[in-house]
From Swiss-Prot:
This is Serpin B6. Expressed in the inner ear hair cells, keratinocytes of hair follicles and epidermis in abdominal skin. GO terms for molecular function: serine-type endopeptidase inhibitor activity. The modification Phosphoserine is found at S153. One of its GO terms (biological process) is gonad development. It comes from Mus musculus. Belongs to the serpin family. Ov-serpin subfamily.
Length: 378
């Protein structure tokens, strides 16, 4: 297995577990865009700061810790994922904003552009705090086709802010096999043993790849997007099994093993999947701190590969991701749906996502987890 791919996959599942500690909350993030944004900052880190970042990003498995091969790996990964001519739309806004007193090194700026196609921008956080915040928000909105606004809420930056890493991503893809809007109807979603909430449930009967993992009592369904460059992978535990059991068990190695296409049966399935829209905003500082990246956010930070200025540290790492799942695919215009009853033939297997599940948007060629999330409640 490619070491960078393994590092990114490990980091993805670690983050999913940390951000999902409150099991009642929905979770949605793009681990690949977070790791690429942080890897860019990692280029400027030295000493303990660098080794902690390598550990948090699971890059300690990659040779030449901090060496060029990691950044070259990200360069080819990002080129592949963001390439033009795909049947899906992916818009990433990745930028490091530094206070104009930071004096960022030209060599660091060049590397960011070369490997991450990211420009750095120097703002006046000290003198024009609010203007700087609004400037960042406007830039992100423009980069994500106005889907992601207000990435920085009021008060998130102040006159002491020195470095802000902003990462926002917006994805739009159509299902290879679309759901018929006329089959969408209201059904109860079992939030917990004692609570139900109504949800607009989509329905599709067709052939899909599906498997059952006995050790965790979980069905796994694969829903391909048009041209099959990306798949949505849904992990749905049996009704008597808590989703947290699955979350505890899943590692990147198991994820790859469980979702191997040659291990899945292609069969006719009745799929019930809720329509949902999630927009999640994370201040990543706490999660990264829990993964061992402690020095980067305070006075002990060493970013001498980025600037010769002493005392430079990362003030904020913010991540915002948006997903909408509907009949056409992911993110499309809303439509009203007629009511219809679905007659169920007994012998067709069912995949009925009417209780909490995990979902992943998986990039087939690179085996990368572009997005991952948990749908706990409508």
């Amino acid at each position: 297995m490619d070491p960078l791919q393994e590092a990114n996959g490990t980091f993805a599942l670690n983050l999913l577990k940390i951000l999902g500690e409150d099991s009642s909350k929905n979770v949605f993030l793009s681990p690949m865009s977070i790791s690429s944004a942080l890897a860019m900052v990692f280029m400027g880190a030295k000493g303990t700061t660098a080794s902690q970042m390598a550990q948090a990003l699971a890059l300690d498995k990659c040779s030449g810790n901090g060496g060029g091969d990691v950044h070259q790996g990200f360069q080819s990964l990002l080129t592949e994922v963001n390439k033009t001519g795909t049947q899906y739309l992916l818009r990433t806004a990745n930028r490091l904003f530094g206070d104009k007193t930071c004096d960022l090194l030209a060599s660091f700026k060049d590397s960011c552009l070369k490997f991450y196609e990211a420009e750095l921008e120097e703002l006046d956080f000290q003198g024009a705090t609010e203007e700087s915040r609004q400037h960042i928000n406007t830039w992100v909105a423009k980069k994500t086709e106005d889907k992601i606004k207000e990435v920085l809420s009021p008060g998130t930056v102040n006159s002491d802010t020195s470095l802000v890493l902003v990462n926002a991503i917006y994805f739009k893809g159509n299902w290879e096999k679309q759901f018929n809007k006329e089959h969408t109807r209201e059904m109860p979603f079992k939030v917990s043993k004692n609570e139900e909430k109504p949800v607009q449930m989509m329905f599709k009967k067709s052939t899909f790849k599906m498997t059952y993992i006995g050790e965790i009592f979980t069905k796994i369904l694969l829903l391909p997007y048009v041209s099959s460059e990306l798949n949505m992978i849904i992990m749905l535990p049996d009704e008597h099994v808590e989703l947290s059991t699955v979350e505890k068990e899943v590692t990147y190695e198991k994820f790859i093993e469980w979702t191997r296409l040659d291990k899945m049966d292609e069969e006719e399935v009745e799929v019930f999947l809720p329509k949902f829209k999630l927009e999640e905003n994370y201040n990543m500082n706490d999660a990264l701190y829990k993964l061992g990246m402690t020095d980067a956010f305070g006075g002990r930070a060493d970013f001498s590969g980025m600037s010769s200025k002493q005392g430079l540290f990362l003030s904020k790492v913010v991540h915002k991701a948006f997903v909408e799942v509907n009949e056409e695919g992911t993110e499309a215009a809303a439509a009203t749906a007629g009511m219809m009853t679905v007659r169920c033939m007994r012998f067709t297997p069912r995949f009925c996502a009417d209780h909490p599940f995990l979902f992943f948007i998986h990039h087939v060629k690179t085996n990368g987890i572009l997005f991952c999330g948990r749908f706990s409640s409508p």
